[in-house]
Amino acid sequence: MSSPPPARKGFYRQEVTKTAWEVRAVYQDLQPVGSGAYGAVCSAVDSRTGNKVAIKKLYRPFQSELFAKRAYRELRLLKHMRHENVIGLLDVFTPDETLDDFTDFYLVMPFMGTDLGKLMKHETLSEDRIQFLVYQMLKGLKYIHAAGVIHRDLKPGNLAVNEDCELKILDFGLARQADSEMTGYVVTRWYRAPEVILNWMRYTQTVDIWSVGCIMAEMITGKILFKGNDHLDQLKEIMKVTGTPPPEFVQKLQSAEAKNYMEGLPELEKKDFASVLTNASPQAVNLLEKMLVLDAEQRVTAAEALAHPYFESLRDTEDEPKAQKYDDSFDDVDRTLEEWKRVTYKEVLSFKPPRQLGARVPKETAL
């Protein structure tokens, strides 16, 4: 049996949990961190700076047009985002030397250490930590939304946190295809806005605000706020707290089926949020009442939520970084697999690091 060709100059090969990795020699001490539906992540040390980084390898990104489209979109979104509360790219590389050989690429990002889901399992969060974490979520969302991107699947596991309680949003804007279309992966609907769960209408950026409300409530009480067993059960759980919506809201629903269903529901009174969120401060309750609104048009935006008195002590007068609009017209073009490979290869080669390589990485991107 012929042995594989030697690693590309400046690269080395290593097997990590039965998968061959071929990475740039500057990234040492590969350690598996986790894996999901689309890829695996290792931590490594950037030998130029001594900083720990996370390297993501996508599983066979070019196995189908659907996977290729997703890989291309993930790469372009990561290249686009430059905000301290949104994960961005430090580097991207391929061990393949030509377009004809191009089958894999690796995404290098700041290593954060843990995620909010794991953090909540291990400790009870104090009010000031909750405040700081929610503030960062909203700052990141304000930036993502200004770029014209909707996250769509915000949950504790998508919020990376380091030991200084600094937070970055992961996996934004990727949940565009139905998840089952990709891998049959089961999605967590507990944090999803009702209009997403039930496909009520074209949804807007405030779907992400609903998710922040669910996450914030869970941080306060230590319990998942709406834990439904299926779509309709999820809606019932939500309406036990929000109450059934008024007729004018039901009229806005685009689906006749959804309208009929909603009209047939027994009327439920809105609960007093303070009784649901024991231990929450009045300002926290007031903010949550503005986020967890069934009617998406009545929900606060990220910018409005940031202006809420709850964040008075944290508000930063410095100018927020301005988001450039993300042009997604490239993402929805119909392309052959070879064309997806070609445009992705071009994106990999055109990457410019966010700052001088070799410079000390600032605190917010390092553990």
From Swiss-Prot:
The modification Phosphotyrosine is found at residue 185. The modification Phosphothreonine is found at residue 183. GO terms for molecular function: ATP binding; magnesium ion binding; MAP kinase activity; protein serine kinase activity; protein serine/threonine kinase activity. It comes from Rattus norvegicus. The TXY motif contains the threonine and tyrosine residues whose phosphorylation activates the MAP kinases. Residues 27-311 form the Protein kinase domain. ATP binds at residues 33-41, 56. Its cofactor is Mg(2+). The gene is Mapk12. It catalyses: L-seryl-[protein] + ATP = O-phospho-L-seryl-[protein] + ADP + H(+); L-threonyl-[protein] + ATP = O-phospho-L-threonyl-[protein] + ADP + H(+). The active site is at 153 (proton acceptor). Serine/threonine kinase which acts as an essential component of the MAP kinase signal transduction pathway. MAPK12 is one of the four p38 MAPKs which play an important role in the cascades of cellular responses evoked by extracellular stimuli such as pro-inflammatory cytokines or physical stress leading to direct activation of transcription factors such as ELK1 and ATF2. Accordingly, p38 MAPKs phosphorylate a broad range of proteins and it has been estimated that they may have approximately 200 to 300 substrates each. One of its GO terms (cellular component) is cytoplasm. A motif (TXY) lies at residues 183-185. Monomer. Interacts with the PDZ domain of the syntrophin SNTA1. Interacts with LIN7C, SCRIB, SYNJ2BP and SH3BP5. Interacts with PTPN4; this interaction induces the activation of PTPN4 phosphatase activity. It is found in: Cytoplasm; Nucleus; Mitochondrion. Its EC number is 2.7.11.24. Highly expressed in skeletal muscle, lung and testes and also in the heart and thymus of both adult and neonatal rats. Its main location: cytoplasm. It comes from the Eukaryota. Belongs to the protein kinase superfamily. CMGC Ser/Thr protein kinase family. MAP kinase subfamily. One of its GO terms (biological process) is intracellular signal transduction. Keywords: ATP-binding, Cell cycle, Cytoplasm, Kinase, Magnesium, Metal-binding, Mitochondrion, Nucleotide-binding, Nucleus, Phosphoprotein, Serine/threonine-protein kinase, Stress response, Transcription, Transcription regulation, Transferase, Ubl conjugation. Binds 2 magnesium ions. This is Mitogen-activated protein kinase 12. Changing residue 185 to A: Loss of kinase activity. SMART domains: S_TKc. Dually phosphorylated on Thr-183 and Tyr-185 by MAP2K3/MKK3 and MAP2K6/MKK6, which activates the enzyme. Ubiquitinated. Ubiquitination leads to degradation by the proteasome pathway.
